[in-house]
């Protein structure tokens, strides 16, 4: 992890400018991939937000389901960017670079916020040292709040209902470290600029853990606001099916390996390898259970195990390299377009 004097100073100056604004501007960022109908519902829900100083930026991945056409014909003011790869880290960086607001609020394309969502999160930023704030997530398929005070070890073992207070999980090198759910987090743009944005190697998981980890290690505070609850449908994606069952663990294991290798200055590769071996055993047991229950065919079972092994192998190799640096430009404030 690298910290340069210039980005640090620039980040602090920008944070000071944020504080001078009575009503900070917010960019609501929605990264999407092949979820045309869910995205359209989310965009309509954002019209009900009661905070007025916000814009919406949609980053469309390589969708093939008519998402681009829907966005072209959408009858409300929003800005659209594209991401040529199916990778959440890269997509979030495009959203941040496009954001004209002082703060960037991330919500998933299959999530619905309450009308007071932004107002509930904003007071956390009255503290100039807070770099990120987020709330709880109501898991619609489970029918309950499932993401509350989230923490994760530097080896990628997560807990979405950790005992408080959050201060137990903050401070340089904290392990486990507090993080915010990626579908319900607001981050100071200047802080994102300082830490070089999201890790583009993280294609489908641990992007939220990684950004909070690096913000924490850079000295920024992280606030958990339990009253800010977002409803999350957890629609099918490249990893899970419509029954919420993991069908391809590649991205999970690859992203976990990358995070574990790059979450500290001097990673313990022996510990990472041991963690991956145990994780592979657990995923193999899961695949065996799915096969026995008739949810996987023998061919699907074989592919599942092969994908798990490939994810661990490829993630470890990628994690050994340097973290890719994304230079976040200054905000294009002239492009700010209030969402109506």
Give the location of each predicted region.
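Short, flexible, basic/aromatic active-site loop/helix in glycosyltransferases
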Residues: 153-177
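N-proximal low-complexity "stem/linker" segments adjacent to membrane-targeting elements
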Residues: 1-47, 340
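Conserved donor NDP-sugar-binding/catalytic core segment of glycosyltransferases
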Residues: 115-153
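A conserved acidic beta->alpha catalytic loop
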Residues: 45, 52, 60-69, 111-112
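Non-catalytic, C-terminal membrane-associated alpha-helical segments of glycosyltransferases
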Residues: 268-340
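A short, conserved alpha-helix in the catalytic core of glycosyltransferases
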Residues: 179, 183-196, 201-229
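Short aromatic/hydrophobic "clamp" motif used to bind/position activated sugar donors
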Residues: 104
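Glycine-rich, basic loop-to-helix element that forms the pyrophosphate-binding segment
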Residues: 82-99, 171
